[in-house]
From Swiss-Prot:
This is Conotoxin Cal5a L1. The cysteine framework is V (CC-CC). The modification 4-hydroxyproline is found at P50, P58, P62, P64. It comes from the Eukaryota. Residues 23-42 form a propeptide. Contains 2 disulfide bonds that can be either 'C1-C3, C2-C4' or 'C1-C4, C2-C3', since these disulfide connectivities have been observed for conotoxins with cysteine framework V (for examples, see AC P0DQQ7 and AC P81755). Keywords: Disulfide bond, Hydroxylation, Ion channel impairing toxin, Neurotoxin, Secreted, Signal, Toxin. GO terms for cellular component: extracellular region. Cal5a-cal5e are found in dissected venom (DV). Expressed by the venom duct.
Length: 76
């Protein structure tokens, strides 16, 4: 009887491990693509050059504005 219980436990454990390893492979591939996309977005954001504001003058903040197409606010 103990042999059959041990055998069933071993079979259940192997099936669980196979399922986990398959899901790791799938998420690993998707995670790799997400990582590449994130690195490309960070690189593109780093390529943005700040430009001077056109409304510089007394009482104005001369900080450069960010001209990124996604961001509309100025960085300070």
């Amino acid at each position: 009887m103990r042999f059959y219980i041990g055998l069933m436990a071993a079979l259940m454990l192997t099936s669980i491990l196979r399922t986990d390893s398959a899901s790791v492979d799938q998420t690993g591939a998707e995670g790799g693509l997400a990582l590449i996309e994130r690195v490309i977005r960070q690189r593109d954001a780093a390529d943005v050059k700040p430009v001077a504001r056109t409304n510089e003058g007394p009482g104005r903040d001369p900080a450069p504005c960010c001209q990124h197409p996604i961001e509309t606010c100025c960085r300070r």
